[in-house]
Amino acid sequence: MSSSELKIEAKERLVGKKKEAAIVILLVMVVTSVLGKLCGAFTINSTALDGLNSGSSVVVSTESQTPMQMLGRIIFFVVNTFLSLGMTSYFLKISRGEDAKIEELWSKGKLLPKALAVGIISGVVVALGYLALIIPGIILTIAYSMTSYLLIDNPDMGILDILKNSRTMMKGNKWAYFCLGISFIGWLLLLLPTIGLLSFWLFPYIDVTFCAFYNNLIGKGGVENAVEAETVEGE
């Protein structure tokens, strides 16, 4: 399916669900914003303590992190991963015409450990790619873009299998994924003049569109057929 066809499908799936989808986005924004400020408070307090302990009024260090700073970042990463997984599950259901409830946001707690492991491993690999050059980093980011969907659809799939299957599924599809993302730039630029209010409509639209991209990849045959098809094409 083309980008325009995926977008049309996303709009159709969101009919009658826009208000609830906006609430989901709002909840995620509020939680991550508040948590971000709390984690920032950890950083400020720990920096102030460092300053008092060293006898100086202000101490700013970018070379090392205090235990409180590390704790703040870890908490934010865990909660953000948890909410992202739930949000992806919510919009994946919408993209398939299934009954999606707000409770979906916190319904994937059992998958959190595996989601954290997948996020850490893929994050390290992508970071190494960006250290080399920007383009390799982008390619690796796209290569691992299917991991959340795969985990939600296949909770018993191993961590390394999720990473491997995502890479395999995206062979020959990276450019289409990249172009789909680029096609939303115009809308994203409108976030500033609308003071971010457009995000409550735009983010569900984008998320459901990318869910449709994933659904189109796996088709009716499921993940196994999609992986097998991409493997054969790559040979």
Would you name each region that the model predicts?
Residues 1-235:
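Hydrophobic alpha-helical membrane segments
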